Amino acid sequence: MNGGNHTSMTELFILGPTEDPTFCIAFFVIFLGVYMVTLVGNISIITLIRISSQLHTPVYLFLNHLAFVDILYSTLVSVIMLMELLEHELALPVAACAAELCITVLFGSSECFLLAAMAYDCYVAICSPLLYSTLMSSRVCFLLLGMSYVGGCMNGWIFTGCLLNLSFYGPYQIDHFFCDFSPLLKLSCSDVSIIGIIPSISSGSIIVVTVLVIAVFYICILMTILKMHSTDGCHKAFSTCNSYLTAVTLYYGTITFIYVMPKSNYSTEKNKVLSEFYTVVIPMLNHLIYSLKNRDVKDALRKAIVRVYT
């Protein structure tokens, strides 16, 4: 990082979710439980998709990668947060902090693109079922996956590049539970009038574009569903859309508040709560929302259990 005329910063101290020792143990138990549920649930989804031939379809390929992203994302944030709760304050080298910021933004942005890709898959399946094998070929699927990760990488590099161009002065304490851009910005002695808004513009663009893509696809899906004469077909389509839209609303709602809304609109504590929700809780909810309400996944799980015990 550019140190300017100030003392060069070599490490940062992350204060964690709370500075009250009374709550540290309770928070540790809660977040450890949430992390274990996230880990076991998403690993189970990945394993089930791999071993069940009936789930070897594009939608479950995207779900497989969504689970993979959630595992890495929640692991990176949760492990550091649990260490903070045990030690009440965690010292991280600047390079490690920059790497954490880059990786969390990378996977968070990739998740936005994956959700948009899943919306496209649902659109093709409902609106153009006869062309599904052509429009969702292996080549198209891997292209969508590649674009998701490349888009995430670009946003991660933008955040990290802005961070590395800031100058800092002590005390080097981050009032947060991971190396997020907004708390780091408060430590800077640089002019942040431009650098401070670049990440918001970048993240805001990703959110707006992917939300518009999802909205267009689901308007088309809704119009197609309303034209259906089969009650069972309508019910199945609405059920699929309902679980997806629930996950989308939760995810996009929180990241919009954190990365797009003006920082003066909410307090540090509210920022912490929102960040905990989308970095720790949402990865746990995703596999529950997508899987437990999905008939194909439940059937595949039932068959897998039967194979194990017979």
UniProtKB/Swiss-Prot annotation:
Record topology, Cytoplasmic segments: 47-54, 121-133, 218-237, 293-310
Residue positions with a glycan: N5, N165, N265
Family under the similarity heading: Belongs to the G-protein coupled receptor 1 family.
Keyword tags: Cell membrane, Disulfide bond, G-protein coupled receptor, Glycoprotein, Membrane, Olfaction, Receptor, Sensory transduction, Transducer, Transmembrane, Transmembrane helix
Organism (species): Mus musculus (Mouse)
The protein's name in its UniProt record: Olfactory receptor 5P54
Extracellular side: 1-25, 76-99, 155-196, 259-271
Disulfide bonds: C97-C189
